[in-house]
């Protein structure tokens, strides 16, 4: 797995928080990042994918059709990651003899 692959899940997480919380500033607060860093991560994701995911305006954020599809898929992937981590942690619980 390349370093780029590791970064993809982070980009996905940031993008999902922006959508769920309705904006870059709210996502930045939740993720303990600066709004600028969140905006740059989403812009980098869009550049890598070659498609705009979010139509930005001063008043509200609106997903493009591609952004909506990417969000739907992202939340399923992130849920799978969380489930895998939870299951691994349960299996790693120390047990007495």
Regions found by a protein language model. Give the residues of each.
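Short alpha-helical elements of helix-turn-helix
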Residues: 2-21, 39, 68-71, 75-78
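Short helix-boundary/capping micro-motifs
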Residues: 17-32
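Residues within the DNA-recognition helix of helix-turn-helix
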Residues: 34-37, 41-44
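A short LG(V/I)-centered, amphipathic sequence patch enriched
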Residues: 46-63
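A short, exposed helix-loop element centered on a Lys and neighboring polar residues
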Residues: 82-89
């Amino acid at each position: 797995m390349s370093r780029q692959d590791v970064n993809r899940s982070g980009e996905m997480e940031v993008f999902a928080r922006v959508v769920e919380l309705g904006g870059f500033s709210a996502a930045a607060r939740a993720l303990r990042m600066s709004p600028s860093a969140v905006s740059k991560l989403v812009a980098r994701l869009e550049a890598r994918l070659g498609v705009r995911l979010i139509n930005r305006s001063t008043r509200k954020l609106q997903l493009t059709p591609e952004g909506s599809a990417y969000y739907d898929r992202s939340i399923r992937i992130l849920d799978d990651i969380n489930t895998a981590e939870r299951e691994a942690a349960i299996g790693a619980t120390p047990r007495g003899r």
